[in-house]
Amino acid sequence: MVAEESGPGAQNSPYQLRRKTLLPKRTACPTKNSMEGASTSTTENFGHRAKRARVSGKSQDLSAAPAEQYLQEKLPDEVVLKIFSYLLEQDLCRAACVCKRFSELANDPILWKRLYMEVFEYTRPMMHPEPGKFYQINPEEYEHPNPWKESFQQLYKGAHVKPGFAEHFYSNPARYKGRENMLYYDTIEDALGGVQEAHFDGLIFVHSGIYTDEWIYIESPITMIGAAPGKVADKVIIENTRDSTFVFMEGSEDAYVGYMTIRFNPDDKSAQHHNAHHCLEITVNCSPIIDHCIIRSTCTVGSAVCVSGQGACPTIKHCNISDCENVGLYITDHAQGIYEDNEISNNALAGIWVKNHGNPIIRRNHIHHGRDVGVFTFDHGMGYFESCNIHRNRIAGFEVKAYANPTVVRCEIHHGQTGGIYVHEKGRGQFIENKIYANNFAGVWITSNSDPTIRGNSIFNGNQGGVYIFGDGRGLIEGNDIYGNALAGIQIRTNSCPIVRHNKIHDGQHGGIYVHEKGQGVIEENEVYSNTLAGVWVTTGSTPVLRRNRIHSGKQVGVYFYDNGHGVLEDNDIYNHMYSGVQIRTGSNPKIRRNKIWGGQNGGILVYNSGLGCIEDNEIFDNAMAGVWIKTDSNPTLRRNKIHDGRDGGICIFNGGRGLLEENDIFRNAQAGVLISTNSHPVLRKNRIFDGFAAGIEITNHATATLEGNQIFNNRFGGLFLASGVNVTMKDNKIMNNQDAIEKAVSRGQCLYKISSYTSYPMHDFYRCHTCNTTDRNAICVNCIKKCHQGHDVEFIRHDRFFCDCGAGTLSNPCTLAGEPTHDTDTLYDSAPPIESNTLQHN
């Protein structure tokens, strides 16, 4: 007959209904009187145990069995389990020492789970392997076969705060015999009093319920932990309406509080005396552990957690400090501590304040959706912040002010409703290897005499700029990757003077580095590339030093000086820009030294609109247009530059341009080494102009020049060409050994288009043919006049730079000296003007 079960283990039991076979002898161990002794009992995983065979009266002679006297051998496992279900923990441990079978059954996890939940209420085992360490586990994933029993052992000697249960417990001593090590109290204050009177060792379990207005001042190393089913901290709520909910005082060095909700909920939420009241108050010379707590304060005048004073050094971990009506966590007055893996969100003021030499270590906290700043360090506050996720705060993610000096490492600071990091009023700090992105304002903002270190960060995809340094700001900006920002990657203004080095500033929707309003700074060894506007702007009285940078592949200008922008540009590589490598305009007067400027789709250096500048010892080559353009009343100084292998001219001076050109080497350029036009008047001294593929120097369109001590040699078209009406001042020039291809072509009767094609402009006598109805924009070389237009009504135009339209095939009659027409030259009449930057349109 099958026994009917009603006790624990009746459902889904691993033990099948069966009787034991008779054994010749049994194994037993001495009975222990405590849980410590029970820990040595033999335990096995019974879920996979082989099923015992039923005992048949026909197959065994029961009267002859040597173990007949042991009735328990004949009981089914389920019956034994039913009996064991009425035992308490110490009796179970004693039963486990009787024999191997009892050891197996008395260690049944279901028995221990029932006992465990009856005492501690946890629906998952709470492990306590060492002082100050508690954590819950999933039983199925734990390596020990009976985690319920193991946790019971670890938590056994403790006091329980369980309102209403103490009277029942002490009124039924027989029912709870063996639980003398457990104490029960109705209030937390009573339990703390029991610790002071040494009734127990200081482990307090606070069971489910709301505990209001208790006086919880902790002056000893007690351990207080919530005990409840499900999510423990939601079920154990301790609140105060008049005073700080928990106060840790000297003597509580190793105290532990965990797995509960701690609230400060005053009736008058704005009363001024509450500014000294908090959910948690941790004072001098104590280092408690606060673990897995939910912390809430509705008070508008005091922080939720306040850690203050020398020697205050708590560990606060896995806590949720949210929805508070003031500051979440406040660390001040030389306090320290370790704060790890906390959730800090939706607080009315800063998520964290650090002030007055507070110096915490804050790791892996999630600080978000604050109604103010995320982290605020000020008044000499410090701290080490590592691997925190700081985002979606209403003001900056991280603010540093008034001599504060935090270290922020490998954090993510993003999606701020204003900026990412804000350092002001003499703030300092080290910001290292962080990701700063998608903030509405600047990723990093440094102002008002602040001097932080910004190293190794990724600053990207901001809705404004990357790093802004304003208002006498300083700082070291080093080794950062700054990209994809809507405005300038770095902006320096109003007397600020940072050091900017080893950064990559690229792919911005605006410019790379913008220095304006008397900005300064040392900008060296950066790579600035692929920005939509200028790689570097310098304007409005600014004087930065740019040294050893690589500025390249921009969609406009490389470096742009305008509106009295000054400074030093030296030892840089500036290349492959869609516009000029360098532009100087409107009173700007930089010193440009020892740079390599090449590969531009426009000119190398463009000086225009009254620009100045001292341009010395540069190498300017392989630009699509002139190596240097000087225009519109500009007056730079060029010394000792090498300007070569340009796809247009070497130096072009137009529209009233002036300048001093001294000791430059100008060679191997496709057009004239120096072209001077349209009322310009430069001074050229001691230059060498040679090996050009066109003329050495050409002067035209009412321009003049002073030429002293120049050497002009081995140029293809010739050395010096002066258009009609041009007068120059010349002294001690050497014009020698030029190839004179123009004169040779004329003397051989060739059309000059033969040597120029439509890409060059040889200077010689040019004419117009009235018979062929040529326009004012057509010109015919002297040999075509003699041969192709012989007998026509012709008119001498002037000695100047043209190419022959007859030889180009653009006239009605074919040229008899040249080949087939190759190109329409009506619109190709002079060197193409450089493209001027439209950067200002985007300011």
UniProtKB/Swiss-Prot annotation:
Top-level lineage group: Eukaryota
Membrane spanning residue stretches: none
Entry's Gene Ontology BP terms: negative regulation of calcium ion transmembrane transport via high voltage-gated calcium channel; negative regulation of epithelial to mesenchymal transition; positive regulation of protein catabolic process; proteasome-mediated ubiquitin-dependent protein catabolic process; protein modification process; protein ubiquitination; regulation of apoptotic process; sensory perception of sound
UniProtKB keywords: Chromosome, Metal-binding, Nucleus, Repeat, Ubl conjugation pathway, Zinc, Zinc-finger
Pathway where this protein functions: Protein modification; protein ubiquitination
UniProt region (Disordered), positions on chain: 1-63
Biased composition (Polar residues): 30-45
Subcellular location: Nucleus; Chromosome
Zinc finger (UBR-type): 749-820
GO cellular component: chromosome; cytoplasm; nucleus
F-box domain boundaries: 69-115
Start and stop residues of the PbH1 repeats: 311-333, 334-356, 357-379, 380-402, 403-425, 426-448, 449-471, 472-494, 495-517, 518-540, 541-563, 564-586, 587-609, 610-632, 633-655, 656-678, 679-701, 702-724, 725-746
GO molecular function terms noted in the UniProt entry: protein-arginine N-methyltransferase activity; ubiquitin-like ligase-substrate adaptor activity; ubiquitin-protein transferase activity; zinc ion binding
Subunit structure: Component of the SCF(FBXO11) complex consisting of CUL1, RBX1, SKP1 and FBXO11. Interacts with CIITA.
Protein's job: Substrate recognition component of a SCF (SKP1-CUL1-F-box protein) E3 ubiquitin-protein ligase complex which mediates the ubiquitination and subsequent proteasomal degradation of target proteins, such as DTL/CDT2, BCL6, SNAI1 and PRDM1/BLIMP1. The SCF(FBXO11) complex mediates ubiquitination and degradation of BCL6, thereby playing a role in the germinal center B-cells terminal differentiation toward memory B-cells and plasma cells.
Protein name, per record: F-box only protein 11
Organism: Rattus norvegicus (Rat)
